[in-house]
Amino acid sequence: MASSAASSVRPPRPKKEPQALIIPKNAAEEQKLKLERLMKNPDKAVPIPEKMSEWAPRPPPEFVRDVMGSSAGAGSGEFHVYRHLRRREYQRQDYMDAMAEKQKLEAEFQKRLERNKIAAEEQTAKRRKKRQKLKEKKLLAKKMKLEQKKQSEASSETQEQPSSGSEEASGTEDEEEDAPSFITGR
């Protein structure tokens, strides 16, 4: 008997250290406490709640044996049965109407979203086209400026070639003009 008592004795559980009671004052503190609790034991699985399923009424019965009316005799229990069936049917119809309205609103929302997306894409395309046009205009202006510069250089070279003697004299002037001048107004 002593051996059975010894085998049923379990080793003592490790004692948990006492924790101070912390009452969160706002949502951020509450979230912080939850995170700390989760991070104490990262191996433990985190409970993720399932999405609550939307309430739906019971489907209508496939076969109704006795179709009773509201004109059941006084004192009979049939009127209560009729009343409950009628209530369920009205509930089901209201639910179907609400779902149809919800689907209609969702479809309208999706259409509006699509229209907004198309309008935004059109606006973006318009602005992109404008940017490209400006870029091309700047590039064309730059090319024209380079061509004019080349033409002016070519024309100045053609003017300088016939007067080769004056070129030496004008060369010193060019050097003076190219030299940096720190005097304003020169």
Swiss-Prot record:
It comes from Bos taurus (Bovine). Residues 51-143 are annotated as: Required for RNA-binding. Required for pre-mRNA splicing as component of the spliceosome. Binds double-stranded RNA. Inhibits EIF2AK2 kinase activity. Residues 153-162 have a biased composition (Polar residues). Keywords: Coiled coil, mRNA processing, mRNA splicing, Nucleus, Spliceosome. InterPro entries: Prkrip1 (IPR009548). Residues 39-61, 119-186 are annotated as: Disordered. Residues 126-143 have a biased composition (Basic residues). GO terms for biological process: mRNA processing; RNA splicing. Residues 86-153 form a coiled coil. Belongs to the PRKRIP1 family. Residues 126-138 are annotated as: Required for nuclear localization. The keyword Coiled coil applies. Component of the pre-catalytic and post-catalytic spliceosome complexes. Interacts with EIF2AK2. It is found in: Nucleus; Nucleus, Nucleolus. PANTHER family: PRKR-INTERACTING PROTEIN 1 (PTHR13507:SF0). One of its GO terms (cellular component) is nucleolus. This is PRKR-interacting protein 1. One of its GO terms (molecular function) is double-stranded RNA binding. Residues 170-179 have a biased composition (Acidic residues).
